[in-house]
């Protein structure tokens, strides 16, 4: 790890989101200032190919949006499907997806209304979790050169979280919650030559 925090951003703003585009422009401008060179890296032209490279090149996917402003967090879902462990605020998809032992999370609830105070607390919490939980687990190598605990966390993530974000789960939910109920209702309506219609 670097001796200073490095932020990577590859966000896209909706074409009609002028405020979002302005924010991204401001981040890029700040990242070019001498005091931030090497500390903020903005990856331009984010697309599926770049996402694939990012996902295949990391061991942990850290996403720390301001609560409750995470739109969804699909990049974390992509990472999950590729065996990457997540560390995020309990917001967006991670609010539903998080399972203890299958990744790490910052609390869902804010402690402070003042955003600066909340950011300071979140930063301290992030570093504490990184230094006291994540890094020791990651670097606890056995004689074969890998961390059994880290591999267990990856397996837990794939087994306990990933199945909830598949097309099969989505189709099963659709079938159980909508299709079967509507099919039953249809049969009732057409029975006895549409007597109940």
Model-derived regions, located:
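Catalytic binding pocket for nucleotide-activated donors in carbohydrate/polymer assembly enzymes
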Residues: 55-164, 168-182, 186-189
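Short, structured helix-loop element that forms part of the nucleotide-activated donor/catalytic region
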Residues: 13-36
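Short hydrophobic "strand-cap" motifs at the C-terminus of beta-strands
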Residues: 10-11, 43
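Short, conserved secondary-structure transition motifs
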Residues: 13-17, 46-53, 162
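Active-site donor-binding acidic/aromatic loop of nucleotide-activated sugar
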Residues: 38-47
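Surface beta-strand/loop "capping" patches
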Residues: 190-197
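Structural alpha-helical scaffold elements that stabilize or flank donor/cofactor-binding regions
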Residues: 1, 53-54
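Short, small-residue-biased leader/transition segments that mark boundaries at the very start
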Residues: 2-9
């Amino acid at each position: 790890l670097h001796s200073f925090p490095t932020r990577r951003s590859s966000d896209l703003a909706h074409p009609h989101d002028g405020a979002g585009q302005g924010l991204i422009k401001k981040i890029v401008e700040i990242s070019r200032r001498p005091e931030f060179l090497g500390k903020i890296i903005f990856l331009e032209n984010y697309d599926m190919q770049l996402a694939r490279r990012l996902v295949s090149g990391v061991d942990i996917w850290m996403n720390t949006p301001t609560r409750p402003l995470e739109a969804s967090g699909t990049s974390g879902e992509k990472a999950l499907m590729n065996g990457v462990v997540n560390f995020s605020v309990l917001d967006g998809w991670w609010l539903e997806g998080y399972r203890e032992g299958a990744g790490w999370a910052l609390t869902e609830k804010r402690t402070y209304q003042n955003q600066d105070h909340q950011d300071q607390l979140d930063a301290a919490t992030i570093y504490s979790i990184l230094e006291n939980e994540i890094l020791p687990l990651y670097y606890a190598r056995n004689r074969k050169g890998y961390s059994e605990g880290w591999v267990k966390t990856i397996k837990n993530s794939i087994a306990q979280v990933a199945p909830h974000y598949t097309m099969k789960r989505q189709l099963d939910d659709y079938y159980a919650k909508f299709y079967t109920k509507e099919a039953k209702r249809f049969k009732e309506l057409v029975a006895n030559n549409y007597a109940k219609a």
